[in-house]
């Protein structure tokens, strides 16, 4: 969920947003959350044991920062091209430099990160980490900063793009007052391309809030194991199971993506329980794998109705995988779908019927809701027992 935050030191620089459709080149966006509104969100979250982890995406995925404060976050002479585009990554080689850009970049980045973390510090939930801030850290592509003037001298000119990221983040993390924060991010912010810890410049486990492991489970499970074995607090976010923007079916009119899986349904989100168990069994320190997470990227969700449709009932499958015992979710190494489906959809008695009656949620059965699909014979002899 992206929020434009107003009460930082640059209220006049808030990015705009004003379209209830998918953004395009002509979209205009506006508005921001005040400090009071953010405190209201935190109070509500505390009451319901929901932890909010703020995020400022760096050093890649930073186009919003670069557009809002170009004098601080854009190096004019950097014509690097990467992943088919440029203008997406902040000038990391200028951090702590004496140049005019370096001084503005260092000061403004430090203030933005610190003030954002402080805004969300009043959390009292079970899993809240004081001073935690996610910096993302993912998808810094080959070629990033290759043509940046500030990166043409030592030590930067001998580094790959990912090495530059790690060197920058390590320096940032040791820089007061950032060294008082707990930085979190995707696995790339501490791992090399071959899935190893960058021993020279990775942020240390005891200085890290969380590390999210994302991607197809078959490709990134070993990375989760490496992180856990090295004492990092690991969250599994396997895209083939818990990316809720994956399509339910491969039908032409079905919304969603299929790069990670051609079937991202509720059974898939339940199945992450099996993948998580396998990951823990491969680790020498399974207790460092501390949770599962689902993702729904709202930049491709045009309205709240479709958000409900993509998240529900997948979210129930993820909750079952996350919070139920292995004896409930696992039958012979396969997900216990029958148990979950019985409790999800039993006509007017199941969890989905409850959602429909209380929230009028627009979930599976788009656009008419689960009433079109819920089994009406749950309490007969033909029903499946949990």
Give the positions of each predicted feature.
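Feature activates predominantly on carbohydrate-active enzymes
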Residues: 1-110, 114-120, 127-130
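An acidic- and aromatic-residue-enriched active-site/binding cleft used to recognize and process polar
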Residues: 6, 50, 55-61, 137-140, ...
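Soluble non-cytosolic domains of exported or imported proteins
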Residues: 32, 36, 100-103, 107, ...
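Anion (oxyanion) recognition and catalysis
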Residues: 39, 46, 173, 177, ...
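Flexible glycine/acidic-rich beta-alpha junction loops that bind and position SAM and/or redox cofactors
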Residues: 62-63, 143-144, 244-246
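Active-site neighborhood of glycoside hydrolase catalytic domains
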Residues: 70, 81, 87-208, 214-226
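Flexible, acidic glycine-rich loops studded with aromatic residues
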Residues: 183-386
């Amino acid at each position: 969920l992206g929020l434009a935050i107003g009460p930082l030191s640059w209220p006049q620089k808030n990015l705009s947003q004003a379209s209830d459709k998918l953004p395009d080149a002509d979209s205009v966006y506006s508005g921001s959350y005040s400090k009071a509104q953010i405190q209201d969100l935190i109070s509500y979250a505390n009451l319901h044991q929901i932890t909010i982890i703020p995020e400022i995406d760096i050093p890649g995925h930073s186009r919003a920062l670069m557009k809002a404060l170009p004098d601080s976050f854009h190096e004019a002479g950097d014509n690097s091209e990467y992943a088919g585009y440029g203008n997406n990554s902040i000038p990391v080689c200028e951090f702590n430099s004496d140049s005019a850009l370096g001084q503005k970049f260092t000061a403004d980045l430090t203030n933005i990160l610190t003030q954002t973390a402080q805004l969300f510090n009043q959390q009292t939930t079970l899993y809240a980490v004081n001073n935690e801030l996610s910096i993302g850290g993912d998808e810094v592509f080959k070629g990033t900063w290759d043509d940046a003037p500030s990166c043409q001298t030592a030590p930067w000119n001998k580094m790959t793009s990912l090495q530059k990221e790690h060197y920058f983040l390590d320096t940032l993390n040791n820089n007061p007052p950032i060294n008082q924060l707990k930085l979190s991010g995707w696995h790339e912010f501490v791992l090399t391309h071959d899935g190893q810890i960058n021993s020279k410049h990775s942020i240390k486990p005891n200085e890290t809030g969380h590390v999210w492991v994302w991607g197809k489970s078959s490709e990134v499970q070993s990375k989760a194991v490496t992180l856990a074995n090295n004492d990092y607090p690991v969250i599994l976010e396997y895209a083939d199971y818990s990316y809720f923007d994956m399509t339910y079916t491969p039908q032409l009119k079905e919304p969603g993506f299929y790069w990670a899986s051609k079937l991202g349904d509720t059974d898939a989100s339940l199945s992450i329980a099996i993948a998580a168990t396998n990951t823990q069994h491969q680790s020498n320190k399974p207790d460092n794998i501390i949770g599962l997470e689902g993702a729904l990227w709202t930049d491709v969700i045009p309205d709240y109705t479709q958000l409900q449709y993509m998240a529900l009932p997948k979210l129930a499958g993820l909750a079952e995988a996350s919070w139920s015992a292995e004896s409930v979710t696992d039958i012979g190494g396969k997900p216990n779908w029958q148990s979950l489906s019985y409790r999800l959809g039993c006509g007017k008695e199941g969890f989905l019927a409850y959602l429909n009656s209380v929230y009028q949620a627009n979930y599976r059965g788009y656009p008419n809701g689960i009433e079109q699909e819920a089994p009406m014979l749950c309490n007969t002899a033909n029903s499946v027992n949990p």
